[in-house]
Each structure stands twice: as structure tokens, then as C-alpha cells.
């Protein structure tokens, strides 16, 4: 449906036939001329049918900054014309056609401009053409008052707009005021030069030249829109590159892309008459259909339609899968990084080609909305291109050897069934490892679908195997000696169970989150509400990064206007079946969420700003819910919930809010809504979370733009973020070349200064700053064993000192290192292993000189949720300082 058709729907009703209506046309849009064409056709047809004329208000453009920012963030072409001269020329071109009598009679014209040259041209042209009676001049009160007074003396019809705001709504007007000030002080804006303007001056000639240049261009200017993305067309492959460019999401404003969505629905919305697809079990290059299969029912059709069935592996079949991955019969580990880079780019291109099917599968299997599914596909494509690109910085280090670890097990979640598992498998494959993907069973068909992109791109099926299992067979996977590293995205309890059942196998896990946004009295409340509801209720509140806590400074908390607006924003979100593309909030993955159901009960002092409402008979679809008056310690304050429920807490000031957020066990994402730079600095320097967001939503991290990972119980492993420059280095073995002559002191200092010391923004987007920074560990202990050499200890100690990380060194009785290590300036402690195990809880990280350490250390670290960095130290600081 076109813009004109959308606007025409109400006034096409018979009862409005004799009413006029107006619409704004913005000349800075290349397709404004085509829009005018549609508008003229509609207005003339309406008048021919006896209807009243319509009106077109012609402006230069209202939202240049917003359009530019959105384009920058989404990777879309800027929809506005590239220069003011082009905009002015288009304005004159549209104006000339608008003032033709046969057009102006049906579509009256409002000339909205303060530019004296434009006004004079419109005045003279309308009289020449005889259409002045259908034209009005439109100006703002208080701007160029002398111009409208002169127009009145000429008998022109002038409409003056005077912004009016009530005291209690003044904050709503500030953004309008700022926009006007910004526009009116721009160097090429007419009003900037309008004061004391006189003919013959340099300023006059500058403005005259502006107009004349636009006049010369008006009849030759093109009207081709810049936004031409068309998902109906085949995907345009992107060749391998050394710099990854983020994949643009779908522009759903475009009619052709809306048709594409309808095609997706036609293919993927199954009916009871459709036979469900049977997905086999993959064992290397072979497939087998198992008797035990998981059925996938469409939640948006009341669980009455089976989408597909997927075969589940038993323990014996899992052993075969492990054996194939360990032996690597296809020789994936022997491929070069450049070969893998080329294959990953080809896989990304194939993912781009299957975007529609991936979205359709997510809609049918997991209840994802089209928009949420679309950004997942873009993220998956980004992972496929970024990780081999990021590996190159390590491959180019002159004095290290890099080798794959072996087999990587990737266990992925249901809430991001496309992007996160793709990220995990590419992280493993990029280093030359074989990968076994165990996706969340409830979302596994999505993984089966995207795995085909990798196989077809050149990844051997023996190098990438996809499997779902029962609980017993899963334990075989997670405890197998053949698995050299486990990548998990899932619950904190799952990470703890895996770590404790197999403590010696490295685990990199992104786990739970109890994420909060703090809104202070210095925040832009309208903007904050927009960010809050998007973060809380997107994907039905099931993102691990979702905002489930809102901490509001008392003056805002008690403001009835704020409460009403938050309530209105939550209740205005469209909720329901994902097969309706207008719905923003779809179903939850399960209707057996005991934690959420308990949180939907009120505790003392709590009330509902927006009470819970289930909209379907099986209770998958919960409308956005807002609980008011939640206190620290309440169940919904401290418990991670997967559902569209927001808990609102009153705080006295920002510091109290920071303290409350930091008191939580988790530290995944966190947000601040405040325009006060002092508050921003305090919050940024104090909050304990992996991803921090100021004056924007706290979900939707983008690869390489906002690498993702948390702190505390939100992360297990070395704390290296997914989607960041160091992630792939976790899944390879990096060692000094034999006979390395690197001066590690110089290398560490250089690496610290170039990579680790300063926050940096590698994207440089318009309208958003993304600062990537490294934080030093609070403290670390190095445990030495008799076989460790003192030089390794000195390397680790130097790296810690350069990174400003306090280091203690512990060693066995009888293995006295005091004399050899006294010069390091670290506390030295001679203690038995039993004593050291008791002290491990006091350190943020434990460091060793190798992985061959007592099993008791691994077991204790798993029990107390600590990470042991066991990599042998290397002389290259770009590698060593990561630990």
C-alpha cells in the first residue's frame, strides 16, 4: 500500500466526502514528485466524484537529522537528497506543477517557506498561471515577521503557525525547539542570513546564487529514490573482504518488501492438511530418520498444526558423531585461514539468499515476529563474515603459531535460534575446529535450515554436525574427552551443571541477565519510554538482554503524566499471532514458565500499572505487563524472567539505583536514561555489566559494533565478548614459535598502548557512539607448580602490572620461589594446595602456566564459578594481555 493509499483510507469514506484534508510533501525526498503524482490523481478523481478538494503543504523537509541517523544505524542509503541545492530544485519543480490551474483546483497548495526568493517565485508564478486563489503561504510565528507582514499588504493569504504548549507538557516541546534552532542556524539556511538582509550585499548575492542554481537544476533533476532494496530479487553476493561491513536489515516500509513478507507467510504458515516435514538425524555425511522425534507445533495456531518433526539422537549415535568430529575425515583442520575466510563469506551469501525461509521457519517454530527474525538473519550473516576477518589479526602476528583446539561443542538457546548458533559455529570453524551444534530442541529446525548454507558453501558435513538429543545423550556430549571447548548460550544453572560435570573442559558461556534501565529526573522521558518498552517487550520479553527492571527517580516515578505515558506505550503495542505482520509482540516459547507465573502475583506494596492479560487459550501470548511499586528483594526484582513483564522500582537518586543494580547476581546489559553528562560518567564508571547503553535501548547488540557479554553470573569463561575482535582466539591454541626472539617487555607495553589502554569506536556511525573498552581485573592469583619455570611467571606478572591488575603468586611448600620472584613486587605465598583451594574465592581470576594442573583446582573453580586461565604465556602482548 502506497503512502497516498494509506492517507486516503479515512477520507474515502462517504461521510467524509465533503470534507477537505491536507498532507505534507517533503521536497528533500527524491520520490516526493512521484508522491505528488499519486496525490494529484487521487484528488482529481475525488473532485470528479463530487468530493471536496484536498491540500498539499509543500515543505523542504522536517526530519533530516532523524533520517540521517536511522540510515547510518541501519546501513540503509540516506533517503534524502544529497545537497540543499537539489532540495531547493525539487521544491521548485514540485511547486510549478502544483500551481498549474487544473492541479491547484483539486489539490490546493500551501507554500511552507521563509525563503524570500522562494516566496517571491511562488507569488509571481501563481499570478502568472492564475492559481493564486488556491495557494496559501505558511510561516512560523516569530520567524521573518516582516515577510508575512509584507505579504499581508499584498493581499496574500498567509497562515501563521504558533507552537503552543501547556506548562506541564513543556518538556515535549523542547525537541521541537532544538530542531528549529538547529535548522535556523545552519550555514546554508536562509534564516541564518535574513537579519539586516539588503540587496546588493555579499549575503544577498550568496542567497540569490543559491536560488538561481536551484532554478537551473529544477527541470533536469531526477526523481529516483535511494531506498530501492527489494527482497523479491535474488541476493547480491558480497565478495570476501578484509573489513566486515554489517549486513543491512530489511526496510519494511517498501511495498516490494511487504509483498516478500506475504510470500513468506504463504509458504511457512502451515495448515492441518499439510504433512509435516520429517528432519533426519545427521551423523557426519549420512542421515537417518529416527523413531524418536520432536514435534513442532505452531503456537500461533493454538498448537493445532504440526510444522515439522526432527529426529533425536540416542547415546550411541552421539558417540558416532563425536568420533567423526574428532577424526575430522574431511580434513577441515588442515584448511588455511584464507580458505576458511572464503567459505565463510560464501556461507554468508547463502544465508542472505535464504533470509525469507529462515524468517518463516522462526515464525512457525519459535513464534518470532518477522522484524525480530529479520535482524537475527542479519546478525548471523555478520558473524559469518566477521570471525574469519577478526582471526587475521592474530594470524598476522609474526612470532606465534596458531592451531585449532580440535572439536568445539556449541549449545545454543531457543530465544535466538538463528544468530547465536551461527555465531558459535563460525567461531569454532574459523579457527579450523570441527563443530558439533546442539541447538535448543524447541528451536532446532532453524539450525537444520541454516546449516545447509554452510554445507553448500564448502564446509564438510563431517566438520559441522547438527544434533538434538535427550538429556542422557546430551550428558555424553558435554562430558566427552573429544570435546576441547564448549560454547554455551543459556541459563546460569545450565552453565554451572556443565562446568561441574566436566570441569577441565574450557567453557565460554553467556548466561542469564536481570537487566535494568535507570531513568533519572534529567532524562528525556518520552525518548526513555520509547527505549524502555522496546527493550522490555521486544521478542515477548524473552531476550537475555531484555529490560525487566525499570528504576525511576522519585520525582519522575510520582509524575502521573509519566505513568500515563508508560501505560499508554505498553498498551499500544500490537500483540498476537506472528502471522499478522503488524503485531510487535508475539507468543512466548512456552506456556509452562513457572517463574513468570509466580511473578504475575502481587507482593505487598505492588500494584499493576498494566495488568497481565493472556490473549490466547493456551496462554502463549501475554500482552505487555507493567508491575508498579516493586521493592528490592521482591521476587520479580531478583529473578530472571522470560516474558513481557516490566517491574518498576522507585529510587531516590542515581547512586541508589546504581547500588541496587550492582546488588544483583547478574551483570549482562544495563541502561541509563539521562541527559546529564555528570550522571552519565558516574553511571558508566560504576555500573557492573558487560554492555552499557546510554539514552537508547539495551537490546539488539550488533556484531563488531557492540560485542556482547556480561559479568558475574551472566558470563562463564574468560569474559571475552562474542562479536568482538578477540572471541575467535578463545578457540585456538596460540603458542610462541620455537626459538622466538620477541622482547615480551616491549611487546606487552606496545600492545597495551595500542589495543588495551584506550576506549575506541571502530564504527564511527552518525548519531551513535560505540565505545569498546577493556577493564582490568580487580585481582588475580597465579598458582605455580614445581614444573613451571620462573620466566613464565615473570611474563604473567609483567602483563598483570601493565594492565593494572593486582597479582598474587602462590606456590607449593618446598618449591620456594621467593628469591627468584621477589623482584616482581607481587605478594608471594607458600601454601599447600588445600589452602590455596580455600583462597580461590577471593580472586576474580586464577592464572596458571598451563592446563596440566590438579583436577581439584578445576573442580573447586567450577563449584565457586571462577575461571582458570590455563594458556601457557606467550611473548606477544596482543595475545597475552587478553588473559
Q: PLM features: what roles do these ranges have?
A:
Residues 1, 8-242, 845-852:
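Positively charged, amphipathic and often flexible ligand-engagement surfaces
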Residues 291, 295-296, 301-394, 681, ...:
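Glycine-rich loop-to-alpha-helix module at the N-terminal edge of alpha/beta enzyme cores
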Residues 437-453, 466-472, 521-523, 650-654, ...:
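ATP-dependent adenylate-forming carboxylate-activation enzymes
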Residues 398-451, 763, 767, 774-777, ...:
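Substrate-binding/gating loop at the entrance of the active-site cleft, primarily
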Residues 453, 458, 480-481, 485, ...:
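ALDH superfamily catalytic-core signature
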Residues 187, 194-309, 327, 739-744, ...:
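Hydrophobic face of amphipathic alpha-helices that form TPR/SEL1-like repeat modules
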Residues 1, 8, 122, 343-344, ...:
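Extended, hydrophobic alpha-helical segments in both membrane/secreted and soluble proteins
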Residues 294, 307-313, 328-333, 517-520, ...:
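Short, well-ordered beta-strand elements within core beta-sheets of diverse protein domains
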Amino acid at each position: 500500500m502506497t503512502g497516498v493509499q494509506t492517507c486516503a483510507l479515512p477520507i474515502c469514506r462517504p461521510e467524509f466526502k465533503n470534507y477537505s484534508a491536507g498532507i505534507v510533501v517533503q521536497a528533500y525526498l527524491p520520490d516526493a514528485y512521484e508522491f505528488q503524482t499519486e496525490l494529484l490523481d487521487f484528488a482529481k478523481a475525488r473532485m470528479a466524484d463530487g468530493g471536496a478538494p484536498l491540500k498539499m503543504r509543500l515543505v523542504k523537509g522536517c526530519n533530516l537529522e532523524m533520517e540521517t541517523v536511522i540510515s547510518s544505524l541501519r546501513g540503509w542509503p540516506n533517503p534524502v537528497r544529497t545537497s540543499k541545492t537539489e532540495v531547493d530544485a525539487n521544491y521548485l519543480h514540485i511547486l510549478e506543477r502544483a500551481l498549474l490551474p487544473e492541479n491547484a483546483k483539486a489539490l490546493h497548495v500551501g507554500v511552507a517557506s521563509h525563503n524570500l526568493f522562494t516566496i517571491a517565485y511562488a507569488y509571481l508564478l501563481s499570478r502568472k498561471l492564475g492559481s493564486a486563489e488556491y495557494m496559501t503561504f505558511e510561516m512560523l510565528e516569530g520567524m521573518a515577521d516582516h515577510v508575512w507582514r509584507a505579504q499581508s499588504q499584498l493581499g496574500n493569504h498567509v497562515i501563521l503557525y504558533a507552537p503552543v504548549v501547556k506548562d506541564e507538557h513543556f518538556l515535549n516541546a523542547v525537541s521541537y525547539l532544538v530542531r528549529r534552532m538547529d535548522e535556523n542556524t545552519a550555514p546554508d539556511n536562509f534564516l541564518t542570513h535574513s537579519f539586516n538582509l539588503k540587496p546588493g550585499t555579499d549575503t544577498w548575492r550568496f542567497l540569490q546564487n543559491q536560488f538561481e542554481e536551484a532554478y537551473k537544476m529544477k527541470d533536469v533533476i531526477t526523481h529516483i529514490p535511494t531506498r530501492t532494496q527489494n527482497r523479491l530479487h535474488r541476493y547480491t553476493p558480497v565478495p570476501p573482504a578484509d573489513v566486515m561491513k554489517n549486513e543491512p536489515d530489511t526496510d519494511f516500509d517498501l511495498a516490494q518488501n511487504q509483498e516478500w513478507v506475504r510470500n513468506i507467510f504463504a509458504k511457512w504458515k502451515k495448515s492441518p492438511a499439510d504433512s509435516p516435514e520429517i528432519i533426519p538425524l545427521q551423523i557426519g555425511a549420512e542421515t537417518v530418520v529416527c523413531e524418536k522425534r520432536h514435534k513442532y507445533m505452531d503456537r500461533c495456531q493454538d498448537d493445532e498444526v504440526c510444522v515439522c518433526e526432527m529426529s533425536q539422537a540416542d547415546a550411541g549415535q552421539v558417540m558416532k558423531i563425536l568420533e567423526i568430529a574428532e577424526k575430522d575425515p574431511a580434513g577441515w583442520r588442515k584448511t588455511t585461514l584464507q580458505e576458511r575466510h572464503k567459505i565463510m563469506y560464501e556461507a554468508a551469501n547463502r544465508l542472505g539468499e535464504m533470509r525469507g525461509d529462515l524468517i518463516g521457519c522462526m515464525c512457525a517454530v519459535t513464534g518470532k515476529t518477522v522484524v525480530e527474525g529479520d535482524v537475527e538473519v542479519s546478525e548471523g550473516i555478520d558473524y559469518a563474515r566477521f570471525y574469519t576477518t577478526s582471526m587475521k589479526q592474530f594470524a598476522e602476528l609474526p612470532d606465534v603459531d596458531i592451531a585449532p583446539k580440535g572439536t568445539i561443542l556449541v549449545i545454543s538457546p531457543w530465544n535466538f535460534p538463528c544468530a547465536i548458533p551461527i555465531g558459535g559455529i563460525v567461531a569454532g570453524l574459523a579457527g579450523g575446529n570441527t563443530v558439533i551444534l546442539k541447538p535448543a530442541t524447541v528451536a532446532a529446525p532453524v539450525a537444520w535450515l541454516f546449516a545447509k548454507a554452510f554445507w553448500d558453501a564448502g564446509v564438510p558435513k563431517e566438520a559441522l554436525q547438527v544434533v538434538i538429543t535427550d538429556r542422557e545423550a546430551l550428558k555424553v556430549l558435554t562430558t566427552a574427552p573429544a570435546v576441547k571447548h564448549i560454547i554455551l548460550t543459556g541459563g546460569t544453572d545450565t552453565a554451572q551443571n556443565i562446568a561441574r560435570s566436566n570441569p577441565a573442559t574450557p567453557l565460554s558461556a553467556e548466561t542469564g541477565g536481570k537487566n535494568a534501565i535507570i531513568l533519572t529526573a534529567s532524562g528525556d522521558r518520552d525518548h526513555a519510554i520509547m527505549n524502555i518498552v522496546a527493550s522490555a517487550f521486544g521478542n515477548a520479553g524473552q531476550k537475555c538482554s531484555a529490560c525487566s527492571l525499570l528504576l525511576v527517580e522519585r520525582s519522575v516515578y510520582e509524575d502521573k503524566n509519566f505513568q500515563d505515558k508508560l501505560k499508554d506505550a505498553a498498551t499500544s503495542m500490537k500483540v498476537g499471532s506472528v502471522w499478522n505482520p503488524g503485531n510487535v509482540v508475539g507468543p512466548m516459547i512456552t506456556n509452562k514458565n513457572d517463574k513468570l507465573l509466580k511473578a504475575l502475583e502481587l507482593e505487598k506494596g505492588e500494584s499493576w500499572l498494566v495488568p497481565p492479560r493472556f490473549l490466547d487459550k493456551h496462554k502463549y501470548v501475554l500482552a505487555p505487563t507493567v508491575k508498579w511499586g516493586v521493592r528490592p528483594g521482591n521476587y520479580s526484582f531478583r529473578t530472571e524472567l522470560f516474558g513481557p513483564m516490566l517491574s518498576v522500582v522507585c529510587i531516590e537518586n542515581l547512586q541508589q539505583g546504581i547500588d541496587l543494580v550492582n546488588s544483583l547476581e547478574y551483570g549482562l546489559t544495563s541502561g541509563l536514561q539521562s541527559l546529564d553528562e555528570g550522571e552519565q560518567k558516574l553511571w558508566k564508571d560504576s555500573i557492573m555489566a558487560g554492555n552499557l547503553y546510554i539514552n537508547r535501548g539495551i537490546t539488539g547488540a550488533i556484531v563488531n559494533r557492540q560485542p556482547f557479554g556480561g559479568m558475574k553470573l551472566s558470563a562463564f569463561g574468560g569474559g571475552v565478548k562474542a562479536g568482538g575482535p578477540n572471541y575467535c582466539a578463545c578457540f585456538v591454541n596460540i603458542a610462541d614459535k620455537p626459538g622466538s626472539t620477541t622482547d615480551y617487555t616491549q611487546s606487552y607495553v606496545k600492545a597495551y598502548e595500542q589495543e588495551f589502554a584506550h576506549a575506541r569506536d571502530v564504527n564511527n556511525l552518525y548519531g551513535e557512539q560505540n565505545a569498546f573498552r577493556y577493564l582490568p581485573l580487580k585481582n588475580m592469583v597465579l598458582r605455580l607448580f614445581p614444573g613451571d619455570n620462573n620466566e613464565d611467571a615473570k611474563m604473567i606478572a609483567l602483563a598483570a602490572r601493565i594492565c593494572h591488575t593486582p597479582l598474587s603468586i602462590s606456590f607449593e611448600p618446598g618449591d620456594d620461589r621467593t628469591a627468584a620472584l621477589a623482584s616482581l613486587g607481587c605478594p608471594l605465598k607458600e601454601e599447600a594446595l588445600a589452602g590455596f583451594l580455600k583462597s580461590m574465592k577471593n580472586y576474580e581470576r586464577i592464572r596458571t602456566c598451563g592446563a596440566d594442573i590438579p583436577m581439584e583446582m578445576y573442580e573447586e573453580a567450577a563449584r565457586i564459578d571462577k575461571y582458570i586461565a590455563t594458556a601457557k604465556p606467550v611473548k606477544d602482548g596482543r595475545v597475552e594481555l587478553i588473559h
